[in-house]
Amino acid sequence: MKLREEEVRVAAPDCEIRTIWIRPVGDGPWPAVLFYSDIFQLTESTLRTARRLASYGFAVFAPEIYPRTLAGVALEFDDAGKVAGMAGAAATTTAQFDSDRVALLDHLAGRADVTDVFCVGFCIGGHLAFRAAFDERVSATVCFYPTGLQDGQVGADADSRTLARAADVTGRMMVVFGTNDPHVPAAARLQVLTSLYAAGSEHVELHVYAGGEHAFMRDIGPRHDPDLTDASLAAAVSFMTRR
């Protein structure tokens, strides 16, 4: 599928958020996907995944997650990049992540070329996607190996109480893990699922891939698993488009 790509700036209460808008050629309208990256922001690897998702017929809206401290920066997949990404997270409060999300969803709600709104996220972005599911405008959410849900750790806040708010999830939820992910061990995976069911969530889908490492969908580096990536994306597309 032919795609078009452009930069869009979204005004938030205390900053401007640079986003990449990737959509099929044509006038639309399309279902939109709010697409949260990992700590490295909008790298070419991340954008390749976003483009691949757009090729299924979605308009993908990918924001920088650290607009206050790392605007315009795509970090390298090395130790320095990891340190910078963790510092960007540590400098951002849950309230700031949430206010950015509201601004992004407000922007999508105001577009005439958008129908349904979905959300996906990876790593810390998976945690942010889970919080996006608190907004009733998000029809379905897919969290890929989300970090920090089990202890509430996201950004500057030691406990964002994200799982404690599981009852606030209004749409359908799919969560993807790998069994070899040290950031989300078996007990943490069970805690996420148990919290959703205990909160009364009925539309929950869980995928746990044997042998999957953390960030197995990142298409560079030794942890990448192309087969699991294909399976995960196909499952996510099916889940989002299912009624």
Pin down the residues of each PLM region.
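N-terminal cap/leader regions of alpha/beta-hydrolase-fold enzymes
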Residues: 1-243
